[in-house]
Amino acid sequence: MRAFSAATVRATTRKSFIPMAPRTPFVTPSFTKNVGSMRRMRFYSDEAKSEESKENNEDLTEEQSEIKKLESQLSAKTKEASELKDRLLRSVADFRNLQQVTKKDIQKAKDFALQKFAKDLLESVDNFGHALNAFKEEDLQKSKEISDLYTGVRMTRDVFENTLRKHGIEKLDPLGEPFDPNKHEATFELPQPDKEPGTVFHVQQLGFTLNDRVIRPAKVGIVKGEEN
């Protein structure tokens, strides 16, 4: 009985450990179709992403190209503006220089015209001086008519000289001053014991200046120095 039971147990144990062949999974047609659809969707999705990335790259390239183009245009315009500014500044400087030159030329022309006119008037001033010097002191005291005439001539001379002075014309009377070759013309020299050598002791003809510029030097006699 024991022997039978042992044999039965061994037989049962062998059967339970018989290796089984691997089973092939059961795949339905609908599952296969779904898998194919998913693969195609994944492919299309990857392709769409690739196209989108490509388009983005193209857009970025176009934007970069446009930016470079705009930067180039900006640089060109900036350079052009700088050149125009330089030209404008030079033009303004040239115009101002021209204004200064024109102003100086106009002033020179005025001074020249006034100088010529003044020189023509100086003879009249000299004539007034000669006329007044022609009156003798004794005659002025003896005759009221001569005295009145002298006063009238002197007043006329004073009015005339004041008019010249208003236009920048001044008398140059260097009596007692040191000789200045820029303002005086020495016509003779004489020794004068009581005066300093080189001093103007006689004015033969008055000089005149126009706006501090000599238009006629004074003709003078100066003190001669002692000879060694």
UniProtKB/Swiss-Prot annotation:
Q: Name one Pfam family in it.
A: GrpE
Q: Which SUPFAM superfamilies match?
A: Coiled-coil domain of nucleotide exchange factor GrpE, Head domain of nucleotide exchange factor GrpE
The UniProt PTM text for this protein says:
The N-terminus is blocked.
Report the function annotation for this chain.
Answer: Essential component of the PAM complex, a complex required for the translocation of transit peptide-containing proteins from the inner membrane into the mitochondrial matrix in an ATP-dependent manner. Seems to control the nucleotide-dependent binding of SSC1 to substrate proteins and the association of SSC1 with TIM44.
Keywords annotated in UniProt:
Chaperone, Mitochondrion, Transit peptide
Subunit info? Component of the PAM complex, at least composed of SSC1 (mtHsp70), MGE1, TIM44, PAM16/TIM16, PAM17 and PAM18/TIM14. Interacts with SSQ1.
Q: Name one GO cellular component term.
A: mitochondrion
**UniProt-annotated location(s):** Mitochondrion matrix
Gene Ontology terms for molecular function: adenyl-nucleotide exchange factor activity; protein homodimerization activity; protein-folding chaperone binding; unfolded protein binding
Please state what the protein is called. GrpE protein homolog, mitochondrial
Q: Which domain of life is it from?
A: Eukaryota
Q: For the region Disordered, give the residue spans.
A: 46-66
Task: Specify residue ranges for compositional bias: Basic and acidic residues.
Answer: 46-57
Protein species of origin: Saccharomyces cerevisiae (strain ATCC 204508 / S288c)
Similarity section: Belongs to the GrpE family.
HAMAP family in UniProt: GrpE (MF_01151)
Recorded hits in PROSITE patterns, A to Z, give: GRPE
Which GO biological-process labels does this protein carry?
intracellular protein transport; protein import into mitochondrial matrix; protein refolding
Q: Coiled-coil segments, which residues?
A: none
